[in-house]
């Protein structure tokens, strides 16, 4: 078998939707977690520097920010593992379909995973059962754990609902920073508004970031414009936008996983057709 033919057969058996969704998931989670972590740090610095001089005013906010940062660490680890498992599930379903319908030209891992459902080749002969390849044995063990694609569909569905909440929450800081940036634009170009520059403010207390008794709690006029021109504000704003984009990419990947797994499972269990994802 030539190299090109071997590569072509490998590509034919690859679950392309799962591969794309896995790459999108890793990219989105990395963007969301990395940029979100740094954006929270930047927010903490902005609050400490410009919006409150009393540590007790933002002590609770700092605790919340640190808690979210720890959650980000766990989220990155979880999605790295779960994305890999969903990719394995894609190979699993593909291998099972091809095994059931007589196409044995799958990868070693695909055969090992599919063997847990189909029973696989037993290798009977004079020497008894053949000795399995080490990688195939590992995949068979993994396949026993992945042998319930319907449960993976359910877990992914629940995870998608949960991530919808995370996606919505990631839009909140973007909204706050965008409003602040819009106010700064009105200050920089006073002809666009009829309000007095001194009355144009960004109030952190209004969004619940600081308690109402925090002082000063808000920044107005030219002082606010100078904050918007700092690299800290601009970087934090763009980091939150990047985190929002990462959350959106992760949501798309989860939807792709769920649709592909649902369709694949239906084909495998109900329709009996060798379609793969």
Swiss-Prot record:
One of its GO terms (molecular function) is structural constituent of myelin sheath. Residues 2-10, 89-151, 269-277 are cytoplasmic. Residues 37-59, 179-238 are extracellular. A lipid is attached at residue 199 (O-palmitoyl threonine). SMART domains: PLP. Its main location: membrane. It is found in: Cell membrane. This is the major myelin protein from the central nervous system. It plays an important role in the formation or maintenance of the multilamellar structure of myelin. This is Myelin proteolipid protein. The lineage of its organism: Eukaryota, Metazoa, Chordata, Craniata, Vertebrata. The gene is PLP1.
């Amino acid at each position: 078998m030539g190299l090109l033919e071997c590569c072509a057969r490998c590509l034919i058996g690859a679950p392309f939707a799962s591969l794309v969704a896995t790459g999108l998931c890793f990219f989105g989670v990395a963007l969301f977690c990395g940029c979100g972590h740094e954006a929270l740090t930047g927010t903490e610095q902005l609050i400490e520097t410009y919006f409150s001089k009393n540590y007790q005013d933002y002590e609770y906010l700092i605790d919340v920010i640190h808690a979210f940062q720890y959650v980000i660490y766990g989220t990155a680890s979880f999605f790295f593992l779960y994305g890999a498992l969903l990719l394995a599930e894609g190979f699993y379903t593909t291998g099972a379909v091809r095994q059931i319908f007589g196409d044995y030209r799958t990868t070693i891992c695909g055969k090992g995973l599919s063997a847990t459902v189909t029973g696989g080749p037993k290798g009977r002969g004079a020497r008894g059962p053949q000795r399995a390849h080490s990688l195939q044995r590992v995949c068979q063990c993994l396949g026993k754990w992945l042998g319930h694609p319907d449960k993976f569909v359910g877990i992914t569905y629940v995870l998608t609902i949960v991530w919808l909440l995370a996606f919505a929450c990631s839009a909140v800081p973007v909204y706050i920073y965008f409003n602040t940036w819009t106010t700064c634009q009105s200050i920089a170009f006073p002809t666009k508004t009829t309000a007095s520059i001194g009355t144009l403010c960004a109030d952190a207390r209004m969004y619940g970031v600081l308690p109402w008794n925090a002082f000063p709690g808000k920044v107005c006029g030219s002082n606010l414009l100078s904050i918007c021109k700092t690299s800290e504000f601009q970087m934090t704003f763009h980091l939150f936008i990047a985190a929002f984009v990462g959350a959106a990419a992760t949501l798309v990947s989860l939807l792709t996983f769920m649709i592909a797994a649902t369709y694949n499972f239906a084909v495998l269990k109900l329709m009996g057709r060798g379609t793969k994802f």
